[in-house]
Amino acid sequence: MRSTLRKDLIELFSQAGSEFISGQKISDALGCSRTAVWKHIEELRKEGYEVEAVRRKGYRLIKKPGKLSESEIRFGLKTEVMGQHLIYQDVISSTQKTAHELANNNAPEGTLVVADKQTAGRGRMSRVWHSQEGNGIWMSLILRPDIPLQKTPQLTLLAAVAVVQGIEAAAGIQTDIKWPNDILINGKKTVGILTEMQAEEDRVRSVIIGIGINVNQQSDDFPDELKDIATSLSQASGEKIDRAGVIQHILLCFEKRYRDYMTHGFTPIKLLWESYALGIGTNMRARTLNGTFYGKALGIDDEGVLLLETQEGIKKIYSADIELG
């Protein structure tokens, strides 16, 4: 079944609410035979949609699946590019790994890889990312920006802004950014962002943005070593959160910010990022591969590099683990 027809069929059911829609009306709306309509509905049932069929009345949608699915993500997605080419799998080793393979095979910009569970999810510096089934968002987005190599770190900050805005739009939850790639709620990590690049000499071939979000986890779902430092959107709101809705809003915000970035450069993103960032103007400790530095965070420069005012002068921090206070 073509994904566009599946999306259109779900939209028809949603518009009808609790009312039945005749097979002929669906057939006319989708431009296919009534036999094809039946086949399309059977495909939806396989995805977990509960569809009631009554002779001489037609069909109506009783219940959507509780699990994440390609159809749920596609339905209501208002982007033009981001996520329109979508690969969804229930279980995957790593969305980032699959996205790299797709990028190598000329997948178009905006291609999104989403999984309900990762068996080998990873974060920055090859750290393990705990990504269990049924509770989180694990996705990777392929970009093909025409920018110099040295500007690719800016896309991590752009992604962070889009995630903050998308979460607030989808769930009404305000979050903070901790440089460079963590999103926090009340000081606890909720989102991690991993940016990787494929390049040839001085040319960017693709940028892969990996985003992991703790959505519906409760305290007992986290390993003991994470319970005190991690949280989820559901824990913050006290409610179960629609994962597909969060994905849709993040993609829409990302598309808008990415368009701004490609048209107007990094300055609009920089201003937004600093408005959401924790620790600007306060002291922090930056642990880098070349040593640990302590000082006052002045903000980020025009390349997205953290500026730390230390006793020895202003230090540029390109990559580090940050400890606030």
Swiss-Prot record:
Signal peptide: none
Keyword Nucleotide-binding: yes
GO cellular component: cytoplasm
InterPro entries for the chain: aa-tRNA-synth_II/BPL/LPL, Bifunct_BirA, Biotin_CoA_COase_ligase, Biotin_operon_repress_HTH, BPL_C, BPL_LPL_catalytic, HTH_11, Transcriptional_repressor_C
Domain of life: Bacteria
Catalytic activity, EC: 6.3.4.15
DNA-binding residues (ranges): 23-42
Domain BPL/LPL catalytic, chain residue ranges per copy: 74-262
Pfam families per UniProt: BPL_C (PF02237), BPL_LplA_LipB (PF03099), HTH_11 (PF08279)
Any single biological process term in GO: protein modification process
Keywords: ATP-binding, Biotin, DNA-binding, Ligase, Nucleotide-binding, Repressor, Transcription, Transcription regulation
Reactions listed under catalytic activity: biotin + L-lysyl-[protein] + ATP = N(6)-biotinyl-L-lysyl-[protein] + AMP + diphosphate + H(+)
GO molecular function annotations of the record: ATP binding; biotin--[biotin carboxyl-carrier protein] ligase activity; DNA binding; transferase activity
Keyword check for Transcription: yes
Residues involved in biotin binding: Q118, R122, G123, R124, K189
PANTHER family, A to Z: BIOTIN PROTEIN LIGASE, BIOTIN--PROTEIN LIGASE
Family listed: Belongs to the biotin--protein ligase family.
Classification via NCBIfam families: birA_ligase, birA_repr_reg
Role noted for this protein: Acts both as a biotin--[acetyl-CoA-carboxylase] ligase and a repressor.
Name of the featured protein: Bifunctional ligase/repressor BirA
Organism of origin: Bacillus spizizenii (strain ATCC 23059 / NRRL B-14472 / W23)
Gene name of the encoded protein: birA
